[in-house]
């Protein structure tokens, strides 16, 4: 039942930070400004992303906290520090509460990633997991590249790893244009990653079977793809 999430010219950016974080009673859905930000069925996929981001140990940067699915999994791995950027007030409050119960050092950073990330030092992270929600129709399919091209390469240590997703975009691409998830990634993501400084031979993907519920508004494809992008 995936539907078009943004109408032409729509932007939520100015209202996003203080909009209500709509966690439902069963804690299986998060909506903000009527947008379906995250759902619990994504858990196996979020765990896959977390395993990649934590694979080098050390200091991990996570951009977007959401329902803490990836964040909680990351805390199970042998990492040293876990830096998390989140801009929504309600989600950030949940992050602060969650942080007090975790085994590793948590560094919560409040704000839009566009404002926070430029303040972070070069070569600081062993792993990065980027999973934020698009805040406008204009950046629906491209916001991850704004981060990756502007900052991901410089933030990683040599040998560090980046993983990311944009399910709101990929769900639309797999509905409207592609029926092969690996071809979608190859054609729409790889060229942008190479432009950002990563080498194609250091980019790999794994695909998992995962069936979204019928009522999911943003993703209906029955496979998910996890990228592993190494800085050398």
Curated annotation (Swiss-Prot):
Entry keyword set: Methyltransferase, S-adenosyl-L-methionine, Transferase
Q: Which reaction does it catalyse?
A: guanidinoacetate + S-adenosyl-L-methionine = creatine + S-adenosyl-L-homocysteine + H(+)
Q: Which SUPFAM superfamilies match?
A: S-adenosyl-L-methionine-dependent methyltransferases
Q: Which residues bind guanidinoacetate?
A: 38, 42, 131, 167-168
Q: In which pathway does it act?
A: Amine and polyamine biosynthesis; creatine biosynthesis; creatine from L-arginine and glycine: step 2/2
Give GO MF terms, alphabetically: guanidinoacetate N-methyltransferase activity
The EC number(s) this enzyme carries: 2.1.1.2
Gene Ontology terms describing biological process? creatine biosynthetic process; methylation
Against CDD domains, the record matches this protein to:
AdoMet_MTases
Coiled coil residues, start to end: none
Q: Which InterPro entries match?
A: GuanidinoAc_N-MeTrfase (IPR016550), RMT2/GAMT_Mtase (IPR051038), RMT2_dom (IPR026480), SAM-dependent_MTases_sf (IPR029063)
Q: Where does S-adenosyl-L-methionine bind?
A: 16, 46, 65-70, 86-88, 113-114, 131
Q: Where is the RMT2 domain?
A: 1-232
Q: List the disulfide bonds.
A: none
Would you identify the family this protein belongs to, as annotated? Belongs to the class I-like SAM-binding methyltransferase superfamily. RMT2 methyltransferase family.
| Function summary | Converts guanidinoacetate to creatine, using S-adenosylmethionine as the methyl donor. Important in nervous system development.
Q: Tell me the subunit arrangement.
A: Monomer.
> Any idea what this protein is called?
Guanidinoacetate N-methyltransferase
What is the originating organism of this protein?
Answer: Xenopus tropicalis
Q: Which gene encodes it?
A: gamt
């Amino acid at each position: 039942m995936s539907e078009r999430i943004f109408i032409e010219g729509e932007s939520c950016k100015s209202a996003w930070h203080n909009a209500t974080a709509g966690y439902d009673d069963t804690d299986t859905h998060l909506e903000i400004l009527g947008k379906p930000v995250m759902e619990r069925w994504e858990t196996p996929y979020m765990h896959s992303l977390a395993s990649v981001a934590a694979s080098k140990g050390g200091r991990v940067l996570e951009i977007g906290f959401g329902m803490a699915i990836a964040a909680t999994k990351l805390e199970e791995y042998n990492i040293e520090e876990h830096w998390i950027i989140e801009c929504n007030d309600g989600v950030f409050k949940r992050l602060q509460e969650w942080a007090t119960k975790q085994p590793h050092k948590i560094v919560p950073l409040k704000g839009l990633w566009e404002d926070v990330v430029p303040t972070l030092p070069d070569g600081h992270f062993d792993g990065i997991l980027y999973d934020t929600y698009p805040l406008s129709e204009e950046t629906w399919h491209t916001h991850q590249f704004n981060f990756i091209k502007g900052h991901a390469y410089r933030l990683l240590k040599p040998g560090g790893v980046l993983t990311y997703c944009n399910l709101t975009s990929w769900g639309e691409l797999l509905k409207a244009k592609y029926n092969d998830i690996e071809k979608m990634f190859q054609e729409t993501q790889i060229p942008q990653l190479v432009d950002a400084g990563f080498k194609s031979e250091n980019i790999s993907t794994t695909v998992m079977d995962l069936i979204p519920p019928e009522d999911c508004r943003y993703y209906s494809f029955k496979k998910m793809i996890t990228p592993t992008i190494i800085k050398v």
